[in-house]
C-alpha cells in the first residue's frame, strides 16, 4: 500500500486535495518546494517529491514526501530524481545538509535512502502522529562534504549501470 507509512496520505480525492494544498501552502511560505516527477522514458507523470523544512539560515533541508506509482518503483527513476535534487541542493543552493526521514518500519523507503548514499543517524522515538497512531522515525542524511567526497560519484555510477 503506497500510503501505509505516509503522514499525509493522498488516497482518495479529498485526501489528494489536502496533500496538494499542504504542498502548495509550504511553497507559498517558502518552507517547502514540491516537484512533480515526470518519467521521460515513458512520457508519463510518475509521482512527486519535495524539499521541506527548508532552513536557509542553517543551510539545511529535508527531502521527502516522495512517492511513485507502482509502475515506476524499482526502475531507477528515484535514483535519477534524487541525484538531480541533491546536485541542486549542494551545488546550486550551497546547502550543507540534506536530511531524510521515514517511518522506522518502512523498510522499502529506508533501503532506497541508503542506496543513494544516506547515512543513518538514529531513531526519533514516537516523534509524530500518523493516521494509525504515534510512530518512530528514522533519520538519515547526506552532508555536502560526503556528496563531493564520494556519494555523487557512487550514485552516478549506479544510475549509469541501470
Descriptions of predicted regions:
Residues 110-111, 149:
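Alpha-helical elements of the RecA-like P-loop NTPase motor core of helicases
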Residues 101, 119-133:
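Conserved catalytic-core motifs of GNAT/GCN5-like acyltransferases
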Residues 113-114, 140:
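Conserved active-site tyrosine of GNAT-family acetyltransferases
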Residues 100-109:
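Conserved beta-strand-loop-alpha-helix junction that forms the acyl-donor binding cleft
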Residues 1-75, 88, 131-162:
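GNAT-family acyltransferases
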Residues 91-101:
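Conserved GNAT acetyl-CoA-binding A-motif
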Residues 74-88, 111:
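Conserved acetyl-CoA-binding loop-helix of GNAT-fold acetyltransferases
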Amino acid at each position: 500500500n503506497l500510503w501505509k507509512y505516509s503522514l499525509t496520505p493522498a488516497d482518495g480525492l479529498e485526501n489528494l486535495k489536502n496533500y496538494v494544498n499542504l504542498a502548495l501552502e509550504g511553497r507559498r511560505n517558502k518552507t517547502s518546494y514540491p516537484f512533480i516527477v515526470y518519467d521521460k522514458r515513458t512520457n508519463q507523470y510518475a509521482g512527486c517529491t519535495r524539499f521541506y523544512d527548508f532552513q536557509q539560515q542553517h543551510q539545511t533541508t529535508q527531502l521527502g514526501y516522495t512517492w511513485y506509482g507502482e509502475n515506476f518503483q524499482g526502475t531507477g527513476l528515484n535514483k535519477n530524481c534524487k541525484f538531480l535534487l541533491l546536485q541542486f541542493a549542494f551545488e546550486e543552493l550551497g546547502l550543507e545538509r540534506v536530511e531524510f526521514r521515514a517511518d522506522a518500519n518502512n523498510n522499502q523507503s529506508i533501503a532506497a535512502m541508503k542506496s543513494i548514499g544516506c547515512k543513518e543517524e538514529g531513531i526519533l522515538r514516537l516523534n509524530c502522529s500518523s493516521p494509525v497512531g504515534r510512530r518512530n522515525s528514522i533519520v538519515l542524511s547526506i552532508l555536502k562534504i560526503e556528496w563531493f567526497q564520494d556519494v555523487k560519484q557512487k550514485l552516478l555510477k549506479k544510475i549509469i549501470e541501470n
